[in-house]
């Protein structure tokens, strides 16, 4: 899988047996600023059970809270989440990251769960 960053928080990867962690993806320019912009890419091999979570900062950003702490909290929630129902997992992540505050920004969350070749 090929990934690029366009001004968003780092994607979080979960692999069976390898844990859950933010991926180091070189930052690119904010999406839509320059139609001719080049984006550095990162290659990630797909293995059965691979899960990738991508979000906008509206999901995790809280005034007065360090963004790295918010990313770490989301990583922890993803590490503990049940992956048998992605709809429920997404609901859990949205609730866990916003239950204590009023959101002031839009939220986008994408979760990919690779089950393997069929």
Sequence positions of predicted segments:
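Conserved subregion of the PPM/PP2C metallophosphatase catalytic domain
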Residues: 1-118
